[in-house]
Amino acid sequence: MGKLTILVLVAAVLLSTQVMVQGDADQPADRDAVPRDDNPGGTSGKLMNVLIRSGCPWHPWCG
């Protein structure tokens, strides 16, 4: 009976260390992450940035 108890304790320790090393694979920060908007103005904002940088020939568009 003593050997069985030791065997169960060793198995429990090995399983707990495996869980600690591997993690639980459920990362709520990664799963619920919202993609960063690199272009907050959208396509029109990107177009305006290009036009302003290139010396926009259409003054009503360039503001």
Curated annotation (Swiss-Prot):
Residue positions where 4-hydroxyproline is found in the record: P57
Keywords: Amidation, D-amino acid, Disulfide bond, Hydroxylation, Ion channel impairing toxin, Neurotoxin, Secreted, Signal, Toxin
Signal sequence annotation: 1-23
Location of region: Disordered: 24-46
Modified residues (Cysteine amide): C62
Disulfide bonds: C56-C62
Pfam families: Conotoxin
CC terms in the record's Gene Ontology section: extracellular region
In-chain residues carrying the UniProt-annotated modification D-tryptophan: W58
UniProt entry tagged with the keyword Nucleus: no
Subcellular location: Secreted
Propeptide stretch(es), residue numbers: 24-54
Domain of life: Eukaryota
Predominant cellular place of this UniProt entry's protein: secreted
A single GO molecular function term of this UniProt record: ion channel inhibitor activity
Tissue specificity field: Expressed by the venom duct.
Bias kind Basic and acidic residues: ranges: 28-39
Further comment: Exists in two forms, due to cis-trans isomerization at 56-Cys-hydroxyPro-57. The cis conformation is the major form.
Family: Belongs to the O2 superfamily. Contryphan family.
UniProt remark on domains: The cysteine framework is C-C.
Function recorded in the entry: Its target is unknown, but this toxin may modulate voltage-activated calcium channels (Cav) or calcium-dependent potassium channels (KCa).
Official protein name in the record: Contryphan-Eb
Species of provenance: Conus ebraeus (Hebrew cone)
